[in-house]
């Protein structure tokens, strides 16, 4: 992986610096998302890896730190898609769709995360997660989760009575070889 910084000397790969080489991601990173976990305008980078532990990078005084273990999100799975937004906590939560394993829904509690996917019925452990996005499907002022599965059932999860309910239409739900999901609003 590369982390490019546009410094006064031009573009620099921060992972090429000796101080950062020990935290270089050597597994297959499939998806990334920027996360302001503390709500202070400083972003970290969540890297969903395939066959290796999840990474969560933050830059501190010129050094890249991998905080995934400290944040208890360093799980090994078939990471395929990841999104972040105000899903449940009022802060930036993270949803990760995975292949050959359970999905993760990380609830943000003061900058630390707790996986609550099973509690909210969106772990979808027998599907192979692919494209995922957040959207206010029902136009009610909150983010819902739209996720697709490779040759599996696609989901449109909306929060109802403290659980997510899959409201995918039969047409959308049909298993296909899907990779990406996008949302477009028309008013």
Specify the residue positions occupied by each region the protein language model found:
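Beta-propeller blade repeat segments, especially FG-GAP/WD-type strand-to-loop junctions
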Residues: 1-15, 53-67, 102-116, 153-167
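Disulfide-stabilized cysteine-rich extracellular repeat microdomains
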Residues: 8-9, 16-19, 37, 61, ...
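Repeat-based blade/solenoid architectures
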Residues: 20-32, 72-83, 122-133, 170-182
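Acidic/hydrophobic-patterned starts of short beta strands in beta-sheet-rich repeat architectures
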Residues: 39-48, 89-97, 140-148
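Internal metal/ion-chelating core segments
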Residues: 78-85, 94-104, 132-133
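Extended non-membrane alpha-helical scaffolds
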Residues: 83, 88-91, 117, 129-134, ...
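Conserved small/polar residues in nucleotide/adenosyl-binding loops
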Residues: 185-187
